[in-house]
């Protein structure tokens, strides 16, 4: 295979207020848990079923850290894009432990607030940038120059 892709996209709700830590170099890191819920109807009983999956999310990107600090609280609905990483460490008894996390740390990461509890517009951050969605204007489109023929 010539290349590969490690990309995770999630839409869910924050399970508790984000945890903000500071490294020895003064860089802020945010840990949060994001719940995604899948629902379906049982074929036999016609009962509605639900399953919630909890995802560990770690944010290193300075721009996204500042957005989360200001706007994200328990219950916030988020759209996130990041990469999947598994960490390994030894606990106090010397046993190996593993955890898999969705990591947002570079310009390929994205976070969008999907509820507007704290602002009038949805705030989006990507890498070190933060901006509001621009207003979308309706534009008319002239269909007169399109052929009626199918191009294949």
UniProtKB/Swiss-Prot annotation:
Kindly give the PROSITE patterns that the UniProt entry links to this protein: SSB
Q: Could you state a single Gene Ontology molecular function term?
A: single-stranded DNA binding
Polar residues composition bias: residue spans: 117-127
CDD domains with a match to the protein in the record: SSB_OBF
Motif Important for interaction with partner proteins: where?
A: 147-152
Which portions of this protein are annotated as coiled-coil regions?
none
Q: Where is the composition biased (Basic and acidic residues)?
A: 129-144
State the PANTHER family in the record: SINGLE-STRANDED DNA-BINDING PROTEIN
- Please give the function described in this protein's UniProt entry: Plays an important role in DNA replication, recombination and repair. Binds to ssDNA and to an array of partner proteins to recruit them to their sites of action during DNA metabolism.
The protein in question is named: Single-stranded DNA-binding protein
């Amino acid at each position: 295979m010539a290349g590969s892709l490690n990309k995770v996209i999630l839409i869910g709700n924050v399970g508790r207020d984000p945890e903000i830590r500071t490294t020895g170099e003064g860089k802020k890191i945010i840990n949060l848990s994001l719940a995604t819920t899948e629902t379906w109807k049982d074929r036999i009983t016609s009962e509605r079923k639900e399953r919630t999956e909890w995802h560990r999310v770690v944010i290193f990107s300075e721009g996204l850290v500042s957005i989360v600090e200001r706007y994200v609280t328990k219950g916030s609905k988020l759209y996130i894009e990041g990469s999947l990483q598994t960490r390994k460490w030894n606990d106090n008894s010397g046993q190996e432990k593993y955890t898999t996390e969705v990591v947002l740390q570079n310009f390929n990461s994205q976070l969008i607030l999907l509820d507007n509890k704290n602002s009038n517009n949805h705030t989006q951050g990507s890498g070190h940038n933060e901006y509001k969605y621009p207003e979308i204007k309706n534009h008319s489109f002239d269909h007169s120059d399109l052929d009626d023929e199918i191009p294949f």
